[in-house]
Amino acid sequence: MAAFSKYLTARNTSLAGAAFLLLCLLHKRRRALGLHGKKSGKPPLQNNEKEGKKERAVVDKVFLSRLSQILKIMVPRTFCKETGYLLLIAVMLVSRTYCDVWMIQNGTLIESGIIGRSSKDFKRYLFNFIAAMPLISLVNNFLKYGLNELKLCFRVRLTRYLYEEYLQAFTYYKMGNLDNRIANPDQLLTQDVEKFCNSVVDLYSNLSKPFLDIVLYIFKLTSAIGAQGPASMMAYLLVSGLFLTRLRRPIGKMTIMEQKYEGEYRYVNSRLITNSEEIAFYNGNKREKQTIHSVFRKLVEHLHNFIFFRFSMGFIDSIIAKYVATVVGYLVVSRPFLDLAHPRHLHSTHSELLEDYYQSGRMLLRMSQALGRIVLAGREMTRLAGFTARITELMQVLKDLNHGRYERTMVSQQEKGIEGAQASPLVPGAGEIINTDNIIKFDHVPLATPNGDILIQDLSFEVRSGANVLICGPNGCGKSSLFRVLGELWPLFGGRLTKPERGKLFYVPQRPYMTLGTLRDQVIYPDGKEDQKKRGISDQVLKEYLDNVQLGHILEREGGWDSVQDWMDVLSGGEKQRMAMARLFYHKPQFAILDECTSAVSVDVEDYIYSHCRKVGITLFTVSHRKSLWKHHEYYLHMDGRGNYEFKKITEDTVEFGS
């Protein structure tokens, strides 16, 4: 007890009290964060995500399995560029460890020469250090080079894999419209991928170097002070590591929430840019400012909590992984020196004792620092678990969507009050799609939205090539829904749909999409220049397509086919619609869906375009309210918005409606 009481000084008691108080605060903060997460509910911009399916973000077997799955993507083969960089980093880490040991030994000899007043020894070892500086510097910078290149290689591999899945068929559309598990995929595909790759490589370096140091220093120290010293340090590493890992568990979850809030903040800013004109007309800047400030405030509050948590953990990490580890190191290294009966130093001179202490002490200090870095690496590993959970969730959703599986909260037909609703729930993909040329036939197909809201219970009609169809009805009646089912963007919930393959259907929206690229790219999209050559279509033929829609003058005005502009801004609304029709003439599909695509075009130009479509054999499904277009169609499909429809042939007795 007396031996213990000498440590109960006022200073030590204060430090222990501060550490205990901080642990209590940290525990209280963790509980508060958990309660806040339960009470606050779901974020307003991501309220589709199911609480029961949130990904875990802790360091466990699940994390290691996920990490292994992603590493197989980033390092696909035994012999590849990434393996080469991993090997380079490993060699540089070993070289750096040996450089550290050599610098300790050489530095001790320099100091020994100074203390022993030996000018010869001092100059010799100092010259050795000067001669080794270029090599040591080269090793350090080769290590940095390898780490940076490996981060980039990992990012390239993972990004290409994810975009290969994301841009396969209509997956990018389905993720935003048919599945509600992932919010803000742009955040995941860009920032999260970069941070994940950086974190993986940093962890590889921050774990490999300390392990190498420990192995080498244990070998050196065991021969110098015995095996008991290194064994004591390893035992301390195990105990402190388990304790700190337990305290760090919230970091993974907090990392996931940070990235979600960052994604929300990025999303509301992109909405402001995309819809700036509409917002300006409504004078909605104050409302948008409130929205942005609200989302930003939520992000800032979370970051404040995260910063405080990291401050608390940093305080405890510093004490346990650095300073207490140093104290343990001093206790271990001092034993053979303070034990006067120790056989190692019975006949050692003062100079030999000093040199031995410096070498052993510095090695043990470096070993304790290496142990501390391994303990602190647990913090990085917990943060990596957060990124790993998000990337793995994205990969799983992409895989599901590419196999036709998606998850979305279904709206019950009883709640919607639709008469004649099916007793059994709708099953996505339950219908049959048959690919046949020159015909579109809906055979007892329920027209429903992805969340199960039935627009038409049983839709049946048949159209063959050459018979144009005019589709009309109030907003929300199902006109666009019909096209989405026809284009296979939405699942078929039942019945049989007979139609040509996707490439033989073409959709022209009211607001045409202008791609990034040249004037030629606007006409041939989504084809490229090589595809144009394969089709055997010359630039002169492209010029004829522009002339057909009265856009021939644009070729000279914009500086030729290879002119690059921001075409969404350069072209007017009418020019963009006519450009989309020129694009239609280039592709010459069997069927074309025209969704109010000539609303900004004059009647005479519109009349010529429809006549030309008939001339080149393109059958049209047209959504329009213009009476002038009835003469170009043989049938009309009218939807009343209450679940009823009428499909009839247009005759002289048909009452035309529209403007």
Swiss-Prot record:
It catalyses: a very long-chain fatty acyl-CoA + H2O = a very long-chain fatty acid + CoA + H(+); a very long-chain fatty acid(in) + ATP + H2O = a very long-chain fatty acid(out) + ADP + phosphate + H(+); a long-chain fatty acyl-CoA + H2O = a long-chain fatty acid + CoA + H(+); a long-chain fatty acid(in) + ATP + H2O = a long-chain fatty acid(out) + ADP + phosphate + H(+). The keyword DNA-binding does not apply. Homodimers. Can form heterodimers with ABCD1 and ABCD2. Dimerization is necessary to form an active transporter. Interacts with PEX19; mediates the targeting of ABCD3 to peroxisomes. CDD domains: ABCD_peroxisomal_ALDP (cd03223). Broad substrate specificity ATP-dependent transporter of the ATP-binding cassette (ABC) family that catalyzes the transport of long-chain fatty acids (LCFA)-CoA, dicarboxylic acids-CoA, long-branched-chain fatty acids-CoA and bile acids from the cytosol to the peroxisome lumen for beta-oxydation. Has fatty acyl-CoA thioesterase and ATPase activities. Probably hydrolyzes fatty acyl-CoAs into free fatty acids prior to their ATP-dependent transport into peroxisomes. Glycans are attached at residues 12, 106, 206. It is found in: Peroxisome membrane. GO terms for molecular function: ABC-type transporter activity; ATP binding; ATP hydrolysis activity; fatty acyl-CoA hydrolase activity; long-chain fatty acid transmembrane transporter activity; protein homodimerization activity. Keywords: Acetylation, ATP-binding, Glycoprotein, Hydrolase, Membrane, Nucleotide-binding, Peroxisome, Phosphoprotein, Translocase, Transmembrane, Transmembrane helix, Transport, Ubl conjugation. InterPro entries: AAA+_ATPase (IPR003593), ABC1_TM_dom (IPR011527), ABC1_TM_sf (IPR036640), ABC_transporter-like_ATP-bd (IPR003439), ABC_transporter-like_CS (IPR017871), ABC_transporter_sub-D (IPR050835), FA_transporter (IPR005283), P-loop_NTPase (IPR027417). This is ATP-binding cassette sub-family D member 3. The modification N6-acetyllysine is found at residues 61, 260, 399, 533. It is a multi-pass membrane protein. Signal peptide: none annotated. Belongs to the ABC transporter superfamily. ABCD family. Peroxisomal fatty acyl CoA transporter (TC 3.A.1.203) subfamily. The modification Phosphoserine is found at residues 424, 659.
